[in-house]
């Protein structure tokens, strides 16, 4: 099914009916409006109702919707059929749509490396000495993109009365609590605003107003349909029932009940306004959750059944099935010529950083798939709360593309925390508590300061400054300064004979080339000084108590894994060559070559992950602090961490999940 392109034909009934007869019928019959209530994922029932309306030929002159009712109603008003909307609902990846994490393939190599530092990706803003949180758990970037893709055929229509069916979306002003009726502007933005449940989704700013879910002010917009000109209103109520006392079992259920109070109050007020000429359809939805969008398609038959039960009343409105013609919009992205590009950028980043990532050029036809990929890459810069696009026209009548990049209200300073615990249940355990401070968009080219600290198994404090030196971040420099204390146990014949502590500081300076989002080359120089002490035991060989490091490291990194922890596709390879000499500041001369990687094979729901590690020290000349170490979870799990050490290493593991 083609979800994102409406057919090029205009559906006309003139072949069946003389034009004067059709016109007279359209003028004489009462105007019918459709009011679709909010109800989250329960909105799948609206599709079932639309199927019956189509089958019976009921003419719909106006549509007003709230929240999920606005989404279903907006798609129908834009020209999609009930079957096409069902296809969209079935094929949408709701897990991705309701997530703000960019696809890993679109993230920069730097962001991929940072991901490995903290298992949990969540963070908080930190500005002027205060913690700041986002205005919603979900900021909605992927929802925005989903709506723009679905409604691309009508994205140029700014007056909702000009849609195939005139349409209104209902939202609520977060500041005043007033009902806001959206009758024009960006249709994707209107739908996004109407369904922004406070707290769950960030509000949407339209015309200098912060808008949230319309259910707070008018969950069943009967009055809106009436004001549009409807003589008869078909109202479909899918709102959730109030929770019983037995169902109020936690703070979450109490919060849900408070929301139900507001929604139920506005719904009841609209129900009271229905007259004898109007029709109310209330699908029986039982315990279907308003939050589980993956189950929404299963609710369609409930809506169909409820509408069919009122088939006689609907047939009377159909007047023999002579519905007015529906015009389906003609709009193919490949026919749209981009004559200019506008960048609306509220961040410190230079506009060229955004423009250089657009796979769209002035004077070319628009490629929607390429544009969406570009939007993903801009969003993955981790600076913006949303990146959207509009088709616009300038004063000269030229057609163009406008990219809207809205910076995060709770950035660009972020704090992130992590805790690592491990135990072999035989007396050996470790912990590591870490925190990171990140300052994004320090300058027009996207410089970034990152401070990472940890205590526990390894104490470390590092200051890292990453500076791209061109708008596409192809070249970069990265100076770093760090303090570090590490403890190593030295084993011999499965006996821990000594504990070694290395305490020191170091500086690194790197220059690199990002070949693309999957491949990178870099060269680093590291200079470090540290003290080494044997805390307990005896190594059995002399140890230099002063460590001097002066090294050049050349590295190639490839990372196309779709997930760091449980990948289903892609590969990972890191290979490096290390050269140290007295002339560089080291205590001696030594060379190493090493690498590690992962390869994934997937078949249906079965995944196989092959990991490898290789390390080789030329002439066995590497000092003890540069020995390879193995042992611990996933790296010979039967051994304690770093139980094996030496000048050479090789390990291969195979995992199934």
Task: Locate the predicted segments by residue.
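Positively charged n-region of N-terminal signal peptides that target proteins for export
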Residues: 1-5
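Bacterial N-terminal signal peptides
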Residues: 7-17
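Patatin-like phospholipase
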Residues: 22-66, 74-376, 380-387, 392, ...
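Short, well-ordered secondary-structure micro-motifs
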Residues: 179-182, 245-247, 292, 533-534, ...
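Short beta-strands and strand-coil junctions in structured, solvent-facing domains, enriched
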Residues: 241-243, 349, 363, 410, ...
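Gram-negative/organellar outer-membrane beta-barrel architecture
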Residues: 369-374, 386-561, 628-634, 642-650
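C-terminal transmembrane beta-barrel domains of outer membrane proteins
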Residues: 450, 464, 571-657
């Amino acid at each position: 099914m083609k979800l994102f392109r409406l057919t090029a034909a205009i559906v006309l009934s003139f072949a069946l009916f003389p034009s004067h007869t059709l016109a007279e019928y359209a003028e004489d019959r009462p105007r019918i409006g459709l009011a679709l209530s909010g109800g989250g994922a329960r909105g799948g029932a609206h599709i079932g109702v639309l199927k019956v309306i189509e089958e019976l030929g009921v003419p719909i002159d106006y549509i007003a919707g709230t929240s999920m009712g606005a989404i279903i109603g907006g798609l129908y008003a834009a020209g999609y059929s009930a079957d096409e909307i069902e296809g969209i609902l079935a094929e949408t990846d709701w897990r991705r749509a309701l997530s703000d994490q960019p696809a890993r393939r679109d993230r920069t190599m730097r962001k991929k490396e940072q991901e490995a530092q903290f298992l949990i990706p969540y963070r908080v803003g930190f500005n002027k000495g205060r913690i700041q949180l986002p205005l919603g758990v979900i900021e909605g970037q992927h929802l925005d993109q989903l709506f723009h893709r679905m409604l691309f055929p009508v994205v140029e229509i700014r007056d909702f009365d000009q849609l195939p069916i005139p349409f209104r979306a209902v939202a609520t002003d977060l500041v005043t609590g007033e009902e806001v009726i959206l009758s024009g502007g960006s249709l994707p933005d209107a739908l996004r605003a109407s369904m922004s449940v406070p707290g769950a989704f960030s509000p949407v700013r339209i015309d200098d107003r912060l808008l949230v879910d319309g259910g707070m002010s008018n969950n069943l917009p009967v009055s809106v349909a009436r004001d549009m000109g409807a003589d008869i209103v078909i109202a479909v109520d899918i709102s959730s029932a109030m929770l019983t006392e037995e169902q109020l079992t936690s703070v979450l259920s109490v919060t849900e009940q408070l929301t139900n109070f507001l929604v139920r109050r506005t719904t009841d007020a609209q129900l009271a306004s229905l007259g004898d000429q109007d029709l109310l359809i209330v699908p029986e939805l039982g315990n279907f959750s308003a939050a589980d969008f993956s189950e929404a398609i299963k609710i369609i038959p409930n809506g169909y059944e409820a509408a069919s039960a009122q088939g006689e009343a609907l047939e009377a409105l159909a007047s023999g099935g002579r519905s007015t013609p529906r015009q389906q919009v003609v709009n193919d992205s490949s026919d749209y010529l981009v004559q200019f590009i506008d960048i609306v950028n509220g961040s410190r980043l230079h506009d060229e950083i955004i423009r250089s990532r657009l796979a769209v050029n002035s004077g070319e036809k628009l490629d929607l798939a390429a544009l969406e990929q570009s939007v993903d890459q801009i969003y993955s810069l981790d600076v913006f709360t949303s990146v959207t696009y509009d088709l616009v026209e300038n004063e000269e009548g030229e057609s163009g593309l406008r990219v809207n990049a809205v910076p995060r209200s709770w950035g660009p300073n972020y704090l992130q925390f992590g805790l690592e615990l491990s135990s072999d249940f035989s007396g050996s355990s470790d912990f590591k508590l870490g925190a990171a401070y990140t300052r994004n968009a320090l300058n027009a080219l996207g410089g970034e300061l990152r401070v990472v600290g940890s205590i526990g198994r390894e104490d470390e404090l590092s200051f890292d400054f990453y500076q791209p030196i061109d708008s596409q971040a192809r070249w970069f420099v990265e100076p770093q300064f760090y303090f570090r204390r590490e403890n190593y146990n030295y084993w011999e014949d499965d006996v821990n004979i000594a504990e070694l502590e290395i305490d020191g500081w170091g500086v690194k300076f790197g220059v690199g080339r990002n070949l693309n989002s999957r491949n990178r080359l870099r060269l680093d120089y590291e200079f470090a000084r540290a003290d080494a002490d044997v805390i307990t035991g005896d190594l059995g060989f002399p140890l230099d108590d002063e460590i001097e490091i002066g090294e050049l490291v050349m590295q190639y990194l490839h990372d196309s894994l779709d997930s760091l922890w449980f990948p289903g596709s892609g590969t990972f390879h890191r290979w490096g060559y290390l050269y140290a000499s007295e002339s560089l500041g080291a205590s001696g001369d030594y060379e190493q070559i090493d690498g590690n990687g992962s390869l994934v094979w997937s078949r249906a729901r079965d995944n196989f992950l092959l990991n490898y590690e290789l390390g080789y020290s030329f002439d066995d000349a590497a000092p003890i602090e540069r020995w390879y170490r193995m042992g611990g979870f996933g790296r010979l799990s039967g051994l304690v961490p770093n139980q094996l050490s030496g000048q050479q290493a090789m390990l291969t593991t195979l995992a199934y999940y």
